[in-house]
């Protein structure tokens, strides 16, 4: 075996980390230098240190590893940028070309014109964007980024309430909960930490009641929940506000905890004299509109009786967990729903106690995974940073971007982006919003003058490269990773097989570029990948896990992974709960800030209120804002009639408990008719088991199990003459896509669901045949976090009949076809 691996044919290895939300363990069967089979974790299984079992994506990795469409040689563009026409070149020509462009752009414009975009296609310590950032930082720096595509609003909103992102108890503590609200959370598909779904299952077996609130009946709702409550996308804050109304008016909130541990709840504890308190907002003292369940019903399509019942259950089932998913904060005003969930946890006193949950991001106590990256990327000499989602703005108008655009580290950018080095990312095209807009930006070579893409396949983003560098998979090089978000594990990724063709590891590519740029020794420090793995393990042991085995012990004992056992689960804010004066939070007040003075001082109460409020989205079934003041839910007075489902529930005085997906009869009519006549349907995009974002989209094993299709309710389908399995056109003013449909009551009426991550495959007119939802999404961002609001979409759906027999997209016609299927 390579590099002193034990002479056996089964090697424990970390599941290649593509940011699925998990960190799992595989067992690779190796014969004659080839991986022949992948199993999952076979180690002992305990509650304190459970097995890290891989999902179907990890188990299907063998197909990706030996896919016939792997990039084998460096490529150089020969046609129009984006056309997908390339020729093979040598590594020397590729390295020289890239190095020359690096030098040219740096000296012509300055280091801030260089850019490494966000990307998680290779998410361990030694591969992917980490090594590219180390290269750039040693070379003089590049334009920096902050925040993420995944949870930008959560990242910035959570600390405005708690002063930290470490708001989660260790997951073993969920077994102490009596009640769990899975609010827009789908761990069975998107993972959110290996074993999160397993711990929910154990909590339910221990007696916890589990309720899932989601527009779609997800696999998590089906497998883990006692009840599914469909809710109109983008209205979660309205339901949370109405729940607070029930708690306040019925005396169900924890008044003692609120008095001693919170600020901003009522007039006597306001950080700003005379400002509106949370209690006044909920009761409608100033705007004359109490946030009652009836008020929320017409907004959310959730029956008022159901809202009241869930409020009572959550408030009286202490300790209870309200776990927020991330899709609902990737929307217009996504910061509001994050803060609203935190406030519900606070006013019910579910903070700092076993079985409770403070909500927010929920990084795990005690350390929260705050030391994820131990591979030294170094300090960026360029201090300017932009929000990760606004990189296309920096391509178009970087020199005009200021703090008003989220710029940090400088008053104003001094450059537009002129060179992009994209490593293990499909965010240039596929995963970024408003694809057709991005295509137009990147095709204009007077804007971004040079693009390098480094990947395993010719992805949608790769098609816009000037140079493509073929990278190893993570079975073909050394790597190490730790637990995703929950951080209890360190997982080894030993090199198992040799790379095919001329593929090189991300580290080796960057090392050879560094040599040409005159910083070779500084970049490698005399280490190869294996030596850097040893360095990372030593760092983990020094600063975080003193009992972590050495690299030699990992290899000799074929450990694969090491877990810090959770014998006594850590509880976030336990000390603060016990003595808030001795152990204050890091907020300005030292307490839980229901009212944020920081947000108040921004002076934008319509879009960034100091207390969490429901704000109508800019694309909404309720139409355009009736007036500027009407952006706040408190001022909305549109005539919204109750849904038929809500009326039936009200008549019976008990909301229907849907343990299975609802039947068509249970949705006897759509929710309130959309006021958006042109694009009347809301569209959402869930994380499918077919892919990890866009990774695996060309894996036909997974595509067979989870085909790309749009999910539409029978009511919406029948009114459009659409049958199950028909090809349909989904479109709005930004673009159109063609894909098959699945007619099912597992998505609520008025909403369609398109699994995110499918590779963009346009025809010559720009219509996408790959099923990529980002053809439809908007590049608008959230007001406080400057984060993606891609889930705020209105669309229309209609039957589609191709006018061209045997139509194929331009992408599929390319010589280097990223989606070629094999037998």
Where do the protein language model's features map onto the residues?
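N-terminal export/assembly segments and adjacent metallocofactor-ligating motifs
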Residues: 1-252, 278-281, 423, 613, ...
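Extended redox/cofactor-interaction regions of prokaryotic respiratory oxidoreductases
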Residues: 129-200, 206-208, 212-213, 238, ...
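Short beta-alpha connecting loops at secondary-structure transitions
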Residues: 224-231, 475, 479, 488-499
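Glycine-rich phosphate/diphosphate-binding loops that line cofactor/substrate pockets in enzymes
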Residues: 95-114, 170-179, 287-288, 308-321, ...
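Long, contiguous, secondary-structure-rich segments that constitute the structural scaffold
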Residues: 506-557, 694-696, 700-711, 715-823
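Phosphate/diphosphate-binding loops
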Residues: 4, 14-15, 440, 446-450, ...
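N-terminal leader/propeptide and maturation segments of large enzyme subunits in energy/redox metabolism
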Residues: 73-93, 250-304, 496-597, 683, ...
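Active-site phosphate/pyrophosphate-binding segments
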Residues: 243, 268-397
């Amino acid at each position: 075996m390579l590099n002193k691996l034990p002479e056996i044919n089964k090697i424990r290895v970390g599941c290649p980390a593509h940011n699925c939300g998990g960190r799992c363990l595989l067992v690779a069967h190796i014969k004659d230098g080839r991986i022949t089979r992948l199993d999952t974790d076979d180690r002992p299984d305990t509650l304190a240190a459970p097995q890290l079992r891989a999902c179907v994506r990890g188990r299907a990795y063998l197909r990706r590893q030996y896919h016939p469409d792997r990039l084998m040689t460096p490529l150089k563009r020969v046609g129009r940028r984006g056309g997908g026409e390339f020729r093979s070149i040598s590594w020397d020509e590729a390295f020289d070309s890239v190095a020359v462009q690096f030098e040219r752009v740096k000296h012509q414009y300055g280091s801030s014109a260089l850019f490494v975009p966000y990307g998680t296609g290779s998410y361990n310590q030694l591969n992917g964007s980490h090594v590219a950032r180390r290269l750039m930082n040693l070379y003089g720096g590049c334009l920096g980024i902050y925040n993420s595509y995944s949870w930008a609003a959560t990242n910035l909103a959570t600390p405005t309430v708690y002063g930290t992102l470490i708001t989660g108890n260790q997951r073993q503590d969920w077994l102490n909960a009596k009640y769990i609200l899975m609010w827009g959370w789908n761990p069975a598909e998107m993972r959110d930490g290996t074993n999160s779904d397993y711990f929910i299952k154990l909590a339910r077996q221990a007696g916890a009641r589990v309720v899932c609130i989601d527009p779609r009946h997800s696999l998590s709702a089906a497998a883990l929940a006692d009840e599914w409550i469909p809710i109109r996308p983008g209205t979660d804050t309205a339901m949370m506000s109405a729940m607070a109304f029930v708690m306040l008016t019925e005396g169900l909130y924890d008044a003692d905890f609120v008095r001693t541990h919170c600020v901003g709840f009522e007039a006597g504890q306001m950080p700003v004299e005379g400002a509106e308190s949370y209690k006044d907002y909920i009761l409608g003292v100033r705007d004359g509109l109490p946030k009652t369940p009836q008020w929320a019903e017409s907004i959310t399509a959730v029956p008022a009786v159901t809202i009241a019942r869930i409020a009572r259950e959550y408030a009286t089932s202490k300790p209870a967990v309200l776990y927020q998913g991330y899709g609902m904060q990737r929307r217009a005003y996504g910061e509001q729903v994050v803060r609203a969930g935190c406030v519900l946890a606070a006013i019910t006193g579910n903070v700092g106690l076993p079985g409770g949950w403070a909500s927010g991001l929920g990084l795990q106590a005690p350390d929260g995974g705050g030391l994820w990256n131990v591979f030294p990327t170094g300090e960026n000499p360029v201090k300017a940073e932009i929000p990760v989602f606004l990189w296309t703005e920096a391509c178009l108008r970087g020199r005009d971007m200021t703090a008003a655009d989220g710029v940090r580290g400088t008053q104003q950018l001094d450059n537009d982006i002129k060179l992009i080095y994209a490593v293990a990312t499909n965010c240039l095209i596929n995963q970024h919003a408003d694809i057709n807009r991005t295509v137009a930006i990147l095709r204009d070579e007077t804007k971004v003058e040079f693009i390098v893409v480094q990947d395993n396949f010719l992805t949608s983003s790769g098609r816009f490269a000037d140079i493509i560098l073929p990278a190893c998979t993570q079975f073909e090089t050394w790597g190490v990773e730790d637990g995703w978000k929950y951080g209890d594990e360190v997982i080894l990724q030993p090199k198992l097989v040799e790379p095919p063709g001329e593929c090189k590891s991300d580290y080796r590519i960057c090392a050879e570029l560094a040599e040409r740029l005159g910083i070779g020794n500084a970049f490698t420090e005399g280490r190869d990948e294996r030596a850097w793995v040893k360095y990372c393990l030593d760092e983990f042991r020094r600063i975080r896990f003193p009992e972590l085995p050495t690299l030699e012990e990992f290899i000799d004992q074929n450990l694969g992974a090491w877990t810090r056992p959770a014998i006594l689960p850590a509880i976030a804010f336990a000390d603060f709960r016990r003595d808030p004066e001795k152990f204050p939070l890091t907020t300005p007040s030292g307490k839980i800030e229901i009212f944020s003075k920081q947000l108040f001082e921004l002076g934008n109460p319509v879009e960034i209120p100091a207390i969490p409020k429901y704000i109508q989205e800019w694309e909404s079934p309720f139409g355009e804002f009736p007036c500027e003041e009407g952006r706040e839910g408190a001022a909305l007075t549109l005539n919204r009639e109750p849904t038929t489902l809500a009326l039936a529930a009200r008549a019976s005085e008990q909301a229907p408990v849907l343990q299975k997906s609802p039947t068509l009869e249970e949705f006897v009519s759509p929710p309130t008719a959309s006021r958006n006549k042109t694009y009347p349907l809301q569209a959402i995009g869930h994380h499918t088991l077919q892919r990890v974002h866009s990774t695996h989209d060309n894996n036909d094993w997974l595509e067979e199990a989870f085909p790309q299709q749009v999910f539409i309710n029978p009511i919406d389908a029948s009114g459009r003459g659409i049958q199950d399995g028909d090809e349909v056109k989904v479109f709005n003013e930004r673009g159109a896509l063609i894909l098959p449909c699945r007619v099912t009551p597992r998505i609520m009426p008025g909403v369609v669901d398109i699994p995110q991550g499918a590779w963009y495959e346009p025809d010559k007119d720009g219509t996408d045949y790959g099923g990529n939802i980002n053809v439809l999404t908007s590049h608008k961002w959230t007001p406080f976090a400057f984060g993606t609001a891609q889930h705020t979409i209105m669309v229309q759906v209609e039957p589609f009949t191709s006018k061209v027999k045997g139509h194929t997209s331009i992408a599929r016609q390319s010589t280097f076809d990223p989606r070629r299927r094999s037998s």
